C-alpha cells in the first residue's frame, strides 16, 4: 500500500505560516521508515495528516495531495483513514476505550459487528502477538508503560490495517522496555509485511533493528531522505540538532573518520580494528583525578516505605541522601517507584513509614505550598501541570502568586523563555505546541521561581537533542554557578551519562545501588535488574578491550562537558 505526499502543505487555523511546506515523499508498501527532526519540525503534523486527524479533528488549510494506495485522501471520511492506518499515540492513556485489555482490543471489531465467536478468537490471537494473552481481564490503566504500548498496538493490529504509524513510541519507556518495543515492531514488520512509519527522537534506540530509510525534517520541510548509513556518515545530525549514537560521538572525539562503507549505523558491523590505535591515544589523554567534593546534606530520605493499595509496596525501606550542589539521577524501570519518591517529597502523598528531611527539617511539618517554595518539581507529563491558555501566562503564574509587579514578572518570564528556547513562542496558545515544547514550558515555569532543589521527572521525554541539551546545559550552569541541587528521575541513559555524577537505582520498590554513575553504567547485571541497558559507549569500550571501562567512560563524559562549556562561552561572547 503506497503512501505519496505530492507538494503537500498544511497550515493550522491558529497560525499565520504553514507547519508543513511542499512535502514530497513516497513510501512503498512494506517499507519501514523513521521520521526524525527537532521539536516543532512538523513530524507529528505529518503523521496526523497520514492518519486523518488532519483535517477531520484538527482544522487548517491543506494544499497539494496525499494518496494512499493510489486514492486521493482529500475526499476520505475518517473511517476510511482508520481502515488503512493504525496509530499508536505517544500518550497511550488517551487511546484506551475499554475497561479491560480484552475490551480495548475488541473495540474495532465491535464497531464492525463482528460475531462474538470470531471476535474472541481474533482478540486472543492478536493479544498473543504482543505477549498479552494472559492479561486480557486486567485494566489497561494498571499496566506499565511498555504494556500499555502493547495494548495500543494490539488495538490496531486486530483491525488488520496495512499501515502502522508510531508517534514517539519510546518517549515514556525505560531502555529495556524500549528495546523490546523496537523488537516487537520489527517482528511484526517481518511477519506481516505491513508498512511501518515511526516518528521518534531516540534514533540510536530505533536503529536497534534495521530500517529502510530515515526522513529528516526541519521547519516543516524534508531535509534528507536517505539510508541510516548515509545519514550517520554525514554531518546532518549535528547540523539539525539530532543526537547521534554515543559510540559515534566517542569515535569522532578521538579523531576517527567514519566512512559509508564502515556501516556506521551498526556498532556490531563497524571495523573497530581500524580505530584501535586512535582510541587508545585518545584515552591516554584522560585525567583520572576526581574533583568531586561532598558538602552538607540537603535532602535526606530515611527508610521510606509507601503502598498505594495497602498490599504491595511501591517503595520499601528506601534510604539515600543528596548533598547540596550535587547533580544526581534516580534510575529504574517503569513502575519501580521512582515517581513515587517525587510525590512523597511534594507532599501529594504521605509515607507509610520513614521520613524525608530538607536542610534538616522534617518535610511532614510543611504544607504543600511551603514545600513548593523550596522544591521545584517538573512532572513527567506536561499536561498535568499546565493551567493557562497562553505560554506567557503559564510561566508567569507562580511569580504573580508571589505578588511580583508586572514589570518584574515580564522581565523574569522573558529571561527564562529565552534560556529555555521559547522566546519566539511567548504569544502562542499552549495547544499549538508539540509535546516536547509543552515540556519546556513547564520547566520554564519552575525555573522562574528559582528553587533550592530542582527535581525533573523524565525531562527528555518528547524532547529533541538540541532543545534538551540547551535546557540541561542551562540547568547544569545553575548547578555549577549558583549551587542549585538537581535530581533527575529518568531512564534516559544518555542523559544520565552526560549530566549526572551519581546514580541512585531503584528496582522492584527497593534501593539496589547508590554509586558513582560510571560504576552503575559498567555493571550489566545491575542494569538488567533495574530494566535498564548498557550504553553503546560501554559496548564500544568492551569491544575495544579497554581494561579500564569506567575510566574510559569518565573520559568521554569529561570531554563532552568541556565541549559544552566551550560552546556556552562562545555563545556568551557572540
UniProtKB/Swiss-Prot annotation:
GO terms for molecular function: ATP binding; ATP hydrolysis activity; ATPase-coupled transmembrane transporter activity. SMART domains: AAA (SM00382). It is found in: Cell inner membrane. Its EC number is 7.-.-.-. ATP 2 binds at residues 332-339. Residues 3-244, 299-533 form the ABC transporter domain. Keywords: ATP-binding, Cell inner membrane, Cell membrane, Membrane, Nucleotide-binding, Repeat, Translocase, Transport. The keyword Cell inner membrane applies. It is an enzyme of class 7 (translocase). CDD domains: ABC_cobalt_CbiO_domain1. It is a peripheral membrane protein. The keyword DNA repair does not apply. Coiled coil: none annotated. Probably part of an ABC transporter complex. Responsible for energy coupling to the transport system. NCBIfam families: PRK13648.1. This is Putative ABC transporter ATP-binding protein VV2_1533. It comes from Vibrio vulnificus (strain CMCP6). The lineage of its organism: Bacteria, Pseudomonadati, Pseudomonadota, Gammaproteobacteria, Vibrionales.
Amino acid at each position: 500500500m503506497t503512501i505519496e505526499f505530492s507538494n503537500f502543505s498544511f497550515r493550522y487555523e491558529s497560525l499565520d505560516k504553514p507547519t508543513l511546506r511542499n512535502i514530497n515523499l513516497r513510501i512503498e508498501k512494506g517499507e519501514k521508515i523513521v521520521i526524525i527532526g527537532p521539536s516543532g519540525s512538523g513530524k507529528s503534523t505529518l503523521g496526523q495528516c497520514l492518519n486523518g486527524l488532519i483535517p477531520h479533528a484538527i482544522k487548517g488549510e491543506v494544499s497539494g495531495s496525499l494518496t494512499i494506495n493510489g486514492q486521493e485522501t482529500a475526499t476520505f471520511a475518517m473511517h476510511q483513514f482508520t481502515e488503512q492506518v493504525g496509530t499508536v499515540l505517544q500518550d497511550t492513556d488517551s487511546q484506551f476505550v475499554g475497561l479491560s485489555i480484552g475490551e480495548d482490543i475488541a473495540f474495532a471489531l465491535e464497531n464492525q459487528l463482528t460475531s462474538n465467536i470470531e471476535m474472541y478468537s481474533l482478540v486472543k490471537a492478536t493479544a498473543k502477538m504482543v505477549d498479552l494473552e494472559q492479561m486480557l481481564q486486567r485494566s489497561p490503566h494498571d499496566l506499565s508503560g511498555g504494556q500499555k504500548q502493547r495494548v495500543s498496538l494490539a488495538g490496531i493490529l486486530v483491525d488488520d490495517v496495512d499501515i502502522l504509524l508510531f508517534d514517539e513510541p519510546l518517549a515514556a519507556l525505560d531502555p529495556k522496555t524500549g528495546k523490546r518495543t523496537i523488537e516487537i515492531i520489527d517482528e511484526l514488520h517481518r511477519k506481516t509485511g505491513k508498512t511501518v512509519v515511526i516518528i521518534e527522537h531516540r534514533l540510536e534506540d530505533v536503529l536497534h533493528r534495521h530500517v529502510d530509510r530515515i526522513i529528516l525534517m526541519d521547519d516543516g520541510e524534508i531535509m534528507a531522505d536517505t539510508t541510516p548509513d548515509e545519514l550517520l556518515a554525514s554531518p546532518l545530525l549535528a547540523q539539525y540538532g539530532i543526537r547521534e549514537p554515543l559510540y559515534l560521538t566517542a569515535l569522532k572525539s578521538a579523531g576517527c573518520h567514519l566512512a559509508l562503507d564502515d556501516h556506521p549505523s551498526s556498532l556490531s558491523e563497524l571495523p573497530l580494528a581500524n580505530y584501535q590505535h586512535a582510541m587508545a591515544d585518545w584515552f591516554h589523554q584522560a585525567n583520572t583525578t576526581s574533583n568531586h567534593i561532598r558538602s552538607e546534606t540537603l535532602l535526606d530520605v530515611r527508610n521510606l516505605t509507601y503502598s498505594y493499595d495497602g498490599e504491595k509496596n511501591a517503595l520499601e525501606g528506601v534510604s539515600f541522601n543528596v548533598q547540596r550542589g550535587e547533580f544526581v539521577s534516580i534510575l529504574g524501570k517503569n513502575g519501580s517507584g521512582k515517581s513515587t519518591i517525587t510525590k512523597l517529597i511534594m507532599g501529594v502523598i504521605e509515607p507509610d513509614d520513614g521520613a524525608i528531611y530538607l536542610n534538616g527539617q522534617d518535610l511532614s511539618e510543611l504544607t504543600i505550598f511551603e514545600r513548593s517554595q523550596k522544591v521545584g518539581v517538573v512532572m513527567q507529563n506536561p499536561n498535568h501541570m499546565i493551567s493557562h491558555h497562553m505560554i506567557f501566562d503559564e510561566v508567569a503564574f507562580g511569580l504573580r502568586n508571589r505578588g511580583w509587579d508586572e514589570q518584574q514578572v515580564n522581565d523574569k518570564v522573558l529571561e527564562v523563555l529565552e534560556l529555555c528556547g521559547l522566546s519566539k513562542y511567548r504569544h502562542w496558545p499552549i495547544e499549538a505546541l508539540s509535546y516536547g515544547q509543552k515540556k519546556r514550558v513547564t520547566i520554564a515555569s519552575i525555573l522562574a521561581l528559582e528553587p533550592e532543589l530542582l527535581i525533573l521527572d523524565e525531562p527528555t521525554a518528547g524532547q529533541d537533542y538540541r532543545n534538551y541539551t540547551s535546557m540541561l546545559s542551562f540547568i547544569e550552569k545553575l548547578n555549577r554557578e549558583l549551587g542549585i541541587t538537581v535530581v533527575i528521575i529518568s531512564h534516559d541513559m544518555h542523559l544520565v551519562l552526560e549530566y549526572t555524577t551519581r546514580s541512585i537505582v531503584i528496582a522492584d520498590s527497593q534501593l539496589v545501588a547508590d554509586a558513582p554513575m560510571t560504576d552503575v553504567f559498567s555493571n550489566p547485571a545491575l542494569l538488567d535488574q533495574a530494566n535498564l541497558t548498557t550504553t553503546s559507549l560501554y559496548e564500544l569500550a568492551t569491544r575495544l578491550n579497554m581494561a579500564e571501562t569506567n575510566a574510559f567512560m569518565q573520559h568521554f563524559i569529561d570531554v563532552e562537558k568541556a565541549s559544552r562549556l566551550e560552546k556556552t562561552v562562545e555563545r556568551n561572547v557572540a
